[in-house]
Amino acid sequence: MARSAVNPGYLIPVLSKALDILEVLHRYGQPLPLETIHQQTNIPKTTVYRILKTLVHRGYLAHSPNGLYRVVSRPKKTCFGFGKQCGEMPFSEAVTASLRHAAVRAGIELIVLDNRYDPATAIHVAEEFVRRKVDLVIEFQIDQHAAPVIADKIAADGIPLIAVDIPHPHAIYFGVDNYRVGFEAGDLLAEHAEQTWSGKVDSVLGLDIEGAGSLVQSRITGSFQAIQKRLRHLAPASFVRIDGAGIREKSARIVAEFLRQHPRDRRVLISAANDTSGLGALQAVRELHREKHVAIVGQDCIQEAIDEMHRPGSPWIGSVSHEAANYGPALIRLGLAILQGATVPPYNFVEQKLIRADQLRAPAAEKAIPPHRDLSGTTASLSDCERA
């Protein structure tokens, strides 16, 4: 092996000798006696003997009854494959960062590939995980039609699968209770209508992600149910679902179209399936100067949403934090439990936390919101949501 120039004072002689011995054994590729190792390395025989005994003791070498030494095949490091939703989505990147950190702490090799919010790419990523023979796949992709294709390819190779936030066949589900997080968002919107507009509402707009399937769509279902529960007088025609696809640009366009078609609506509630879609709605509201006519609640609690909630007069009144910082440790624990043959629930829900703009803007906001207990048993404060 080529050696780069280095100050001899930085070298550890006995460690260099141990590496020389290992290189000889690797080069020969067969068991060798002490004498051969001594001759090939020119290291004193007593030193060779002591190094060999140390390497045997630590499990790097085996010593056979006939006096030969051989390299022990080290167990392969457990490897997880993670198909992240999209490198341009803040929540996806927060989950990825959490998972990377947790994998390092657990000694897990983590291969991260980007699904790019695209079903064809997600299928290709799944094929790559199969080719690399990972021990377990954690899949975070949005398309319900790609889900069975991805799941079948992974299951055909006998690889366990965890699906994040969007269910997949053959997979253990991990993520939020979509209906409940939607219900929390809707309850806050209804409270805002009661306190600000005396309970009067002209329209309730749900920004859906149709491509993600019925479970993710239940976020909007939950929002509508919460609003109907508190504002029982609202007519069914007041509730409108449109597909923002979880994308800012599309959401901005369709919300702008809706507001132009309803110029007399002065009390509009918007529940967004994710913050990215909600921020698109906010863009449209500002461009049309309708800030005083609208209230928005999102999902994920990304940093831009937190910043918006700090802004006085913003129509953004809250976001449900899915606690992305907790995803990594919980996913690693779940993956290891699956590989160890433990019985795990088919649905594994993470905790969520409603973050309200009125609390963030209040003095000593961090004291106003009590800490919560995360999945790893440590206490997390509002700053965890802000980092996510």
Features from the language model and the residues they span:
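N-terminal helix-turn-helix
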Residues: 2-75
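Hinge/cleft segment of the Venus flytrap/periplasmic-binding protein
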Residues: 76, 215, 323-388
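An alpha-beta-alpha
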Residues: 80-88, 99-101, 185-241, 335, ...
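Periplasmic-binding protein-like
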Residues: 81-82, 133-141, 160-164, 203-206, ...
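Hinge/beta->alpha junction and helix N-cap segments in small-molecule ligand-binding domains
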Residues: 82-97, 112-121, 143, 175-185, ...
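Loop/turn elements at helix/coil->beta-strand transitions in domains of secreted/extracellular proteins
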Residues: 108, 133-136, 156-161, 170, ...
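Hydrophobic alpha-helical
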Residues: 136-155, 223, 243-308
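Flexible loop/hinge segments that line or gate small-molecule binding clefts
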Residues: 144-180, 203, 302-311, 315
